[in-house]
């Protein structure tokens, strides 16, 4: 093999031939997918189709003979899920890859349901069905986002019923394909667009009934994960009551039909008015009952003697007040007399113990007379010893009825 480098590059034909050789060595493969496009010209023997993987949004070009398409076990059309067997091939002229089919099989209903069940278990294990993740539906949505088929009965049912129940209801309608190969992509795009709109408070995903194949887009993994990622509450109204696509398990609220969805996202004006009227009647009745109870209570209070004649309480207690006053006066008189007598006794004892009584019995109090001199005067002192009154000391002698002046002649012998 020639060494390949920037200085020695391969020509396009060499690369194409090598790639075609590698791919040609591959054996036949079985592939499952959804038919997204079928090109079958009347005069052509080869049919060109596109096989799509909805979960990964990838596609593959396939070719087969016209007879193989006409003899297929199901009518091939866009959106049909099939299993094909083909040999990979690379066309060097256009540099394209495709599968040359040798067999086409339809995916049975049982197989579809089994795959949906496997996906259901996977999403459930990841917590996408957890009731704690369900967002509450607003009581009065400012605007209702509606994703449905163009001019469909589902769109008519939702808008008509919701407007009849709440005339002020507003809608942001996104018409999309609700079956076929383009359904999932368009629904997811519309869902994300409405989720980004700040005016949209709730999103309704509506579609009428159909076969299992028709409802396959609503059990698609991509759509289920897109619903779980929404910040806006999502309501599903897909099919009829028995239908149960996987999106019903992910949404915040499931409605049995589009009409049921309209009833669940907006209140009924008439019912709300009846409720308000009933509340007003009950409030008025409660107020009347309260006023009646209070009036009876006031009447009972007014009928009591104490309120009929307020002086009754004073009259009943007047005699007690008079007795209390008499008792208080008597007790005060006795208390004053007892205290007066006690004070008299104390005064007599004080008089007996005082100096005046002693003087009256013939005793005298002798004091030295205050002396003045150059160094200051001396205070008069009670004479307690003969030594305190030497000769010449001036004395003051106090007796019971007055005082006398005297002069000490000094100490004398004897008493």
UniProtKB/Swiss-Prot annotation:
GO molecular-function term, one example from the UniProt record: exodeoxyribonuclease VII activity
GO biological process terms on file: DNA catabolic process
Disulfide bonds: none
Keyword Ligase included in the entry's annotation: no
Subcellular location as annotated: Cytoplasm
UniProt keywords, alphabetically: Cytoplasm, Exonuclease, Hydrolase, Nuclease
GO cellular component: cytoplasm; exodeoxyribonuclease VII complex; peptidoglycan-based cell wall
Catalytic activity: Exonucleolytic cleavage in either 5'- to 3'- or 3'- to 5'-direction to yield nucleoside 5'-phosphates
A Pfam short name: Exonuc_VII_L
Enzyme Commission number(s) from the entry: 3.1.11.6
Family that this chain belongs to: Belongs to the XseA family.
Record text on subunit structure and interactions: Heterooligomer composed of large and small subunits.
Function text: Bidirectionally degrades single-stranded DNA into large acid-insoluble oligonucleotides, which are then degraded further into small acid-soluble oligonucleotides.
Cited NCBIfam families: xseA
UniProt protein name: Exodeoxyribonuclease 7 large subunit
């Amino acid at each position: 093999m020639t060494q390949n480098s920037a200085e020695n590059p391969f020509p396009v034909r060499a690369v194409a031939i090598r790639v075609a050789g590698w791919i040609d060595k591959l054996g036949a493969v079985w592939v499952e997918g959804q038919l997204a496009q079928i090109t079958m010209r009347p005069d052509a023997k080869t049919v060109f189709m596109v096989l799509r993987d909805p979960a990964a949004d990838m596609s593959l070009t396939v070719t087969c003979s016209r007879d193989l398409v006409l003899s297929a076990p199901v009518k091939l059309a866009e959106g049909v899920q099939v299993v094909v067997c083909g040999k990979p091939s690379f066309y060097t002229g256009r540099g394209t890859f495709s599968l040359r089919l040798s067999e086409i099989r339809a995916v049975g209903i049982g197989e579809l349901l089994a795959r949906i069940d496997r996906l259901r278990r996977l999403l459930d294990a990841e917590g996408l069905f957890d009731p704690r993740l369900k967002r509450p539906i607003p009581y009065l949505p400012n605007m209702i986002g509606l994703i449905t088929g163009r001019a469909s009965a589902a769109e008519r049912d939702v808008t008509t019923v919701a407007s009849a129940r709440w005339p002020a209801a507003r809608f942001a309608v996104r018409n999309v394909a609700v079956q076929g190969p383009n359904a999932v992509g368009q629904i997811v795009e519309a869902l994300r667009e409405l989720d980004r709109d700040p005016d949209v408070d709730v999103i309704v995903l509506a579609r009428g009934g159909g076969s299992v194949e028709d409802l396959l887009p609503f059990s698609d993994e991509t759509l289920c994960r897109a619903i779980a990622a929404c910040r806006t509450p999502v309501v599903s109204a897909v099919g009829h009551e028995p239908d149960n696509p996987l999106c019903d398990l992910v949404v915040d609220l499931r409605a049995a039909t589009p009409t049921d969805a309209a009833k669940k996202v907006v209140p009924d004006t008439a019912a709300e008015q009846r409720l308000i009227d009933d509340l007003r009647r009950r409030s008025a009745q409660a107020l009347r009952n309260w006023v009646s109870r209070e009036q009876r209570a006031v009447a009972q209070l007014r009928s009591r003697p104490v309120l009929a004649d307020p002086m009754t309480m004073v009259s009943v207690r007047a005699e007690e007040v008079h007795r209390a006053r008499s008792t208080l006066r008597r007790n005060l008189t006795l208390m004053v007399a007892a205290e007066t007598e006690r004070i008299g006794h104390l005064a007599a004892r004080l008089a007996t113990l005082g100096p005046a009584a002693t003087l009256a019995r013939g005793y005298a109090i002798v004091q030295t007379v205050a002396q003045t001199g150059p160094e200051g005067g001396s205070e008069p002192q009670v004479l307690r010893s003969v030594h305190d009154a030497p000769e010449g000391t001036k004395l003051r002698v106090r007796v019971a009825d007055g005082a006398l002046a005297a002069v000490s002649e000094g100490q004398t012998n004897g008493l």
